[in-house]
């Protein structure tokens, strides 16, 4: 069909997770609870770290920023998703779609670099303990975080420009619950080949550069742990990394599954649930992952609520 016969798309319509009205109510209640736990957990973690001087260390500075970016990208998606569960017409304007997309991409890609910075911090703490205060000074930590947010900003601009400079002049129905790359590319009436290559390359660079930093950091950490003679010392060293490894595995595993594939292999209905996992569930789990076995966080929480730590 001649593309000139199509009208230019000025708004999109989400299909959402389900079209069943009863399931929509159930999902609204479930995801509202999940999002509330997410907000309470991440805001609570930020407040705890800011207010307790015992947590004013590089490790918790990075954890505070992780909670911030988790809160950022989940809040770019969840409120709109919850509202759509209660409405029949899930319409979003072209500009609002671009804005949602931009904030989501910016925070997610910033998180990649925050996780890499956390891995580097663990490497220095375990492998270079005598030089820790110099290598992880306040200035270094600040530069690492500013660099993470700058990388997120650059990625935001690049992704948004590449995706929304395409022509959308056919169907405006997004088979998803938010504005994401694969369903948007599927709707474009432009030739998306070059954009797909550039987007894939950008995603690949961000993923693999940060994974490489994490992998190298943990390779040195593993060597250092093996050299520790006492079993107690090995366990203590490994316990400081266990939470971060869990968070990294969950986050990167899902993101790589979602984005580092050609669009021909996408099943949009199936991928919606993978998107739910990393946009809503992982941000909720991170405060739990990083605090459940952390004595410092538990002690700070007890102090905050006025209970003396044991």
From Swiss-Prot:
It is found in: Cell membrane. GO terms for biological process: detection of chemical stimulus involved in sensory perception; G protein-coupled receptor signaling pathway; sensory perception of smell. Glycans are attached at residue 5. It is a multi-pass membrane protein. It comes from the Eukaryota. Disulfide bonds join 97-189. Residues 1-25, 76-99, 155-196, 259-271 are extracellular. Keywords: Cell membrane, Copper, Disulfide bond, G-protein coupled receptor, Glycoprotein, Membrane, Metal-binding, Olfaction, Receptor, Sensory transduction, Transducer, Transmembrane, Transmembrane helix. InterPro entries: GPCR_Rhodpsn, GPCR_Rhodpsn_7TM, Olfact_rcpt. One of its GO terms (cellular component) is plasma membrane. The chain crosses the membrane at residues 26-46, 55-75, 100-120, 134-154, 197-217, 238-258, 272-292. GO terms for molecular function: copper ion binding; G protein-coupled receptor activity; odorant binding; olfactory receptor activity. Copper binding enhances receptor activity in response to odorant binding. Residues 47-54, 121-133, 218-237, 293-310 are cytoplasmic. Cu cation binds at residues 203, 256, 261. Olfactory receptor that is activated by the binding of organosulfur odorants with thioether groups such as (methylthio)methanethiol (MTMT). The activity of this receptor is mediated by G proteins which activate adenylyl cyclase. Belongs to the G-protein coupled receptor 1 family. This is Olfactory receptor 5AR1.
């Amino acid at each position: 069909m001649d593309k000139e016969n199509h009208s230019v798309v000025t708004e999109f319509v989400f299909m959402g997770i389900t079209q069943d009205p009863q399931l929509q109510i159930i999902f609204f209640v479930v995801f509202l609870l999940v999002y509330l736990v997410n907000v309470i957990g991440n805001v609570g973690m930020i407040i705890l770290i800011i207010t307790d001087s015992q947590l004013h260390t590089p490790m918790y500075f990075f954890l505070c920023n992780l909670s911030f970016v988790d809160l950022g990208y989940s809040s770019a998606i969840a409120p709109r998703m919850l509202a759509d569960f209660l409405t029949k017409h899930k319409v979003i304007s072209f500009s609002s779609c671009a804005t949602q997309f931009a904030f989501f991409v910016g925070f997610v890609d910033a998180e990649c670099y925050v996780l890499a910075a956390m891995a580097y911090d663990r490497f220095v703490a375990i492998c270079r303990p005598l030089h820790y205060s110099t290598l992880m000074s306040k200035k270094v930590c600040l530069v690492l975080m500013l660099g993470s947010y700058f990388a997120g900003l650059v990625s935001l601009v690049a992704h948004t420009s590449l995706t929304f400079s395409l022509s959308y002049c056919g169907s405006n129905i997004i088979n998803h619950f938010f504005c994401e790359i694969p369903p948007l590319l599927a709707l474009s009436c432009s030739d998306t080949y070059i954009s797909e290559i550039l987007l894939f390359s950008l995603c690949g660079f961000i993923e693999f550069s940060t994974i490489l930093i994490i992998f190298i950091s943990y390779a040195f950490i593993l060597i250092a742990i093996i050299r520790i003679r006492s079993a107690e010392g090995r366990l203590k060293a490994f316990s400081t990394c266990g939470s971060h490894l869990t968070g990294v595995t969950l986050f990167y595993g899902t993101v790589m599954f979602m984005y580092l594939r050609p669009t021909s292999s996408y099943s949009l209905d199936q991928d919606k649930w993978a998107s739910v996992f990393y946009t809503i569930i992982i941000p909720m789990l991170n405060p739990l992952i990083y605090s459940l076995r952390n004595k410092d966080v538990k002690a700070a929480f007890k102090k905050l609520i006025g209970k003396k730590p044991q």
